[in-house]
From Swiss-Prot:
Its cofactor is Mg(2+); Zn(2+). The lineage of its organism: Archaea, Methanobacteriati, Methanobacteriota, Methanomada group, Methanococci. It comes from Methanococcus aeolicus (strain ATCC BAA-1280 / DSM 17508 / OCM 812 / Nankai-3). This is Phosphoribosyl-AMP cyclohydrolase. Catalyzes the hydrolysis of the adenine ring of phosphoribosyl-AMP. One of its GO terms (cellular component) is cytoplasm.
Length: 130
């Protein structure tokens, strides 16, 4: 299916965030572990659909980036879901290596302990694993 037709069928709702038209992109692995969340603009979505690999829009660098372009920890797209408002997309990906730039498998490795209000780090630092 051509990319424009795929985008038309998805009908994503890009929101104005800091003067840019963006949507939320959530990446999970095939075991349903939440890996990360980031923004996408329309070009990042098109590039993701064209290549089959996750591309995001960096608000801090003001550019599109391919996940893993420096680390090699790429995300291959397996499935795509849109939420009911169509302003967020959920991508099921095959994660190579780890997702987090802090070297954890998931970016969600900080846990607030509700009993003592302390932040705990969960998961293993992947650099130390190898």
């Amino acid at each position: 299916m051509e990319i424009e037709k795929m985008i038309k069928q998805l009908n994503p709702k890009f929101r104005n965030i800091d003067g840019k038209k963006l949507l939320i992109a959530i990446a999970i692995d095939e075991d349903k572990t939440v890996l990360m969340t980031a923004f996408m603009d329309e070009e990042a979505l098109k590039t993701t659909l064209e290549t089959g690999y996750m591309h995001y829009y960096s608000t801090s660098r003001d550019k599109i980036w391919r996940k893993g372009e420096e680390s090699g920890n790429v995300q291959k797209v397996k499935e795509i879901y849109a939420d009911c408002d169509k302003d967020a997309l959920l991508f099921v990906v095959e994660q190579k290596g780890w997702a987090c730039h802090e070297n954890y498998y998931t970016c969600f490795h900080y846990k607030l302990n509700l009993k003592n209000n302390d932040i705990e780090i969960v998961g293993e630092n992947m650099v130390n694993k190898y």
